[in-house]
Amino acid sequence: TSKTKKEAALYLLKSYYYKAEFALQDEEEKKQIFNKGKSLGEEYINKHPDSAEFRYWYLVNLGSWAQVYGILTAAREGVSDLMKIHSEKIIELDPEYRNGGGYFMLGAVHYKSPYIPFLLSWPNNDEAIKYLQLSVETGKAEINQKNYLAQAVNKDGQHEKARKLLNEVINTKPNLNN
């Protein structure tokens, strides 16, 4: 059935990410797997444009793809713009998905993307803080959300707030259901 195919594709998309991110050491192998995740995500976003989950897991793969390929390749491919567009769409479709996952992705892309005049002029740490704070306040705050927020507020000079957030991260009990 199409529901079964959709579930299998989503599971495969997640599996590509976890395999490349946590099971592989070789950069070339990681690139191959993230390429598969990127392609599968694009295919299923086209098939299911109103799916927050396909967009989210596409962005997870795309963000990791950008890390293994490097900042210049990612900039040439327009990764930051893609991440911004799809994050905004996730927020529009389901702001609660993955405990504010759309807000998290939008905040993370503002935080991690370099400001490049004439090419990438929208990344902004104030916007990163705004969206990362929204992600922490939506649903159950996740460790990764707090970690990114701590980095963004630290960059902004809010060192005490960053320290407080990082202490919360350190003292978080592991979630065995994740």
Please place each PLM-identified region on the residue numbering.
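An amphipathic alpha-helical core segment
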Residues: 133-140, 146-156
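Short coil/linker segments at helix-helix boundaries
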Residues: 2, 12-50, 56-89, 101-135, ...
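Alpha-helix initiation/capping motif
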Residues: 70, 94, 124, 141-142
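Helix-start (N-cap) detector for alpha-helical repeat units in TPR-like alpha-solenoids
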Residues: 6-7, 52-53, 98-100, 142-144
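Ligand-binding pocket scaffold of soluble enzyme catalytic domains
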Residues: 93-96, 100, 144-145, 149-152, ...
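N-terminal alpha-helical scaffold/docking segments in eukaryotic complex subunits
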Residues: 1, 7-8
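Accessory, usually C-terminal, subdomains that scaffold auxiliary metal cofactors
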Residues: 141-143, 147-150, 162-166, 170-173
